[in-house]
Regions:
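Beta-propeller blade termini and top-face loops
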Residues: 1-325, 330-333
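Contiguous beta-strand segments within globular domains
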Residues: 337-364
Length: 365
């Protein structure tokens, strides 16, 4: 809820960083900081989650299942990586990037997955095992989890995807799991997106790049994964890192590919590239800051980018004839900032003001 809000991102060999959602400007001191860093080799940053009810509680993961909770006021972090109960004589496997998340229904509840799925209701202080060894697929034996998700519409509706294409669903918060992997590929399931509008709909993407397969694999199911339909449409045939559903409109989907970000306004029937000045690099992840409607995306090697979704939403409404006129929001004026010398204001403020206008096509300008 800060203004500007903070963006968190994991890097390769340079730990995890965070900073304000402002455009970078070299007239000011660098505002980005390390959330953590290994003093010897930097370390690899993976997934960062912020408690939605407490900005001072931040979770961050390192490679191979390591997970920590940090108090931003004290600067102290503690390890909260789950362990198998002593009575289970088995190995706990993790991929380099381990899926975990804060429940949409309770900010004290966490889920964390390797070849087993764990649940905590006390912010990671203790964990409960809520699955069997899910890599023991009937025909897709795997090593560990690639993706884990919970429905925003139904508490305890969980989805699990492995690194070899096995897909599991639990409708009772892990009490029982059912495999639903038929007629999908054998790739690394990187992204599972339960619909925000229909609880039986779930999207899933997988990549074969780990196995020298550069094809695209994108699916949708309208019955909790029992049956799958391919959703590639006219997307380039290249690895897909994630699939996301828009926060406000169920027809709008976003896909992060090996070379670029794509958007669909018709639920995957057709796709267009999004962001004309975005480098053609691998788009690895995406989040939406709800109060500003900003999309934040991460790339591999080309940094973090921010894109406001309001113009896209207005275009979609106009295309669907939902609104007769485009309504543009009022401009928010921002005072110039003083630079670090405190002698003169920086008139070309980096807090840009969007200007929207409409031209009458019947006239010449």
């Amino acid at each position: 809820n800060k203004v500007p809000y903070n963006i968190y991102g994991g890097t390769q060999d340079d730990a995890t960083v965070y900073g304000p959602a402002d455009e970078w400007n070299n007239s000011f001191n660098e505002k980005w900081k390390y959330l953590w860093i290994d003093a010897w080799d930097g370390g690899d940053g993976c997934i960062t989650r912020v408690d939605p009810n407490d900005n001072n509680t931040v979770y961050f993961s390192l490679q191979n299942g390591a997970l920590r909770r940090k108090n931003m006021l004290s600067g102290i972090s503690v390890s909260i990586k789950p362990k198998l109960p002593m009575i289970i004589n088995d190995n706990l496997n993790y991929n380099f990037i381990t899926p975990y998340f804060i429940s949409n229904h309770d900010s004290n509840t966490l889920y964390h997955a390797g070849n087993y799925v764990f649940k905590s209701t006390d912010r990671g202080d203790s964990w409960k095992l809520i699955s069997n060894n899910l890599i023991n697929s009937s025909d897709k034996p795997s090593f560990s989890a690639g993706a884990l998700a919970e429905s925003k519409l139904e508490k305890g509706l969980l989805y699990y995807g492995s690194d070899r294409g096995s897909f599991w669903v639990s409708k009772n918060d892990g009490i029982s799991w059912e495999e639903r992997s038929e007629k999908i590929g054998n790739g690394y399931i990187r992204s599972i997106e339960p619909s925000k509008f229909n609880k039986s709909v779930v999207y899933m993407s997988m990549t074969g790049i780990n196995y020298d397969d550069l094809n695209s694999y994108l699916y949708v199911s309208d019955n909790y994964g029992k049956n799958w339909k391919k959703l590639q449409g006219n997307l380039p045939n290249e690895p897909i890192n994630f699939i996301r559903e828009d926060e406000n409109f169920e027809d709008i989907l976003y896909a992060g590919l090996y070379r670029g970000l794509y958007v669909s306004l018709d639920r995957g029937k057709s796709w267009n590239i999004l962001g004309k000045n975005l480098p053609m690099s691998s788009v690895s992840d995406m989040e939406v800051h709800k109060s500003t409607n900003d999309m934040i995306i991460s790339t591999h090697g080309r940094g973090i980018y921010k894109f406001n979704l309001n113009p896209l939403h207005k275009y979609y409404l106009k295309q669907e004839n939902i609104s007769d006129e485009l309504l543009f929001s009022d401009m928010e004026m921002v005072l110039p900032r003083f630079n670090d010398t405190h002698k003169e204001p920086l008139m070309d403020t980096y807090q840009k003001v969007p200007i929207s206008f409409k031209l009458n096509s019947k006239k010449n300008y």
